[in-house]
Amino acid sequence: MFIKVKLPWDVTIPAEDMDTGLMLQRAIVIRLLEAFSKEKATKDLGYLITPTILENIGEGKIKEQTGEIQFPVVFNGICFKMFKGEIVHGVVHKVHKTGVFLKSGPYEIIYLSHMKMPGYEFIPGENPFFMNQYMSRIQIGARVRFVVLDTEWREAEKDFMALASIDGDNLGPF
């Protein structure tokens, strides 16, 4: 789910950038975009997608050690985070006999266990897949509608993993 958030952030402008004749607001926006792009995700907000509106620029404070100027800013941004029970679409990118891995938006690790695919059987081979009695296939590249069972934040990688299920109405490959 996409979430609109209001974020406080500290933007640091090197002293040499103040001499280039750039407008201050432009220099702050450029530094904000650079810092925002380096920050992948947070546990509370999910994946940081994009800043949208710069709402406020606070008073700058000079750092005595470096001479840089630090400005507190407040801006609106868009984040993406999956929640338990949410219905989401994803694309299969790995197939194993125990289940499949999907991608959806910035989520790269979504696991759909074979135990959460009722009626589907694993078909081994060069290009393995899962198939049900109606010949519906879950294979690499297949688009799947699933329900999120749970998510987990991975601090070291600064990303999320999710568990999925297609046990329910209107869920599965489409």
Swiss-Prot record:
Highest taxon listed in the record's lineage: Eukaryota
PANTHER family from the UniProt entry: DNA-DIRECTED RNA POLYMERASE II, III, DNA-DIRECTED RNA POLYMERASE IV SUBUNIT 7
Major subcellular location class: nucleus
Family recorded in the similarity comment: Belongs to the eukaryotic RPB7/RPC8 RNA polymerase subunit family.
Organism name: Arabidopsis thaliana
Keywords from the UniProt entry: DNA-directed RNA polymerase, Nucleus, Transcription
Role noted for this protein: DNA-dependent RNA polymerase catalyzes the transcription of DNA into RNA using the four ribonucleoside triphosphates as substrates. Component of RNA polymerase IV which mediates 24-nt short-interfering RNAs (siRNA) accumulation. Implicated in siRNA-directed heterochromatin formation through the action of DCL3 and AGO4, and subsequent DNA methylation-dependent silencing of targeted sequences. Essential component of a self-reinforcing loop coupling de novo DNA methylation to siRNA production.
Keyword Nucleotide-binding attached: no
GO biological process: DNA-templated transcription initiation
Lineage: Eukaryota, Viridiplantae, Streptophyta, Embryophyta, Tracheophyta
Subunit structure: Component of the RNA polymerase IV complex. Interacts with NRPD1.
Compartments it resides in: Nucleus
Keyword Transferase: no
GO cellular component, one term: RNA polymerase IV complex
Protein name per its UniProtKB record: DNA-directed RNA polymerase IV subunit 7
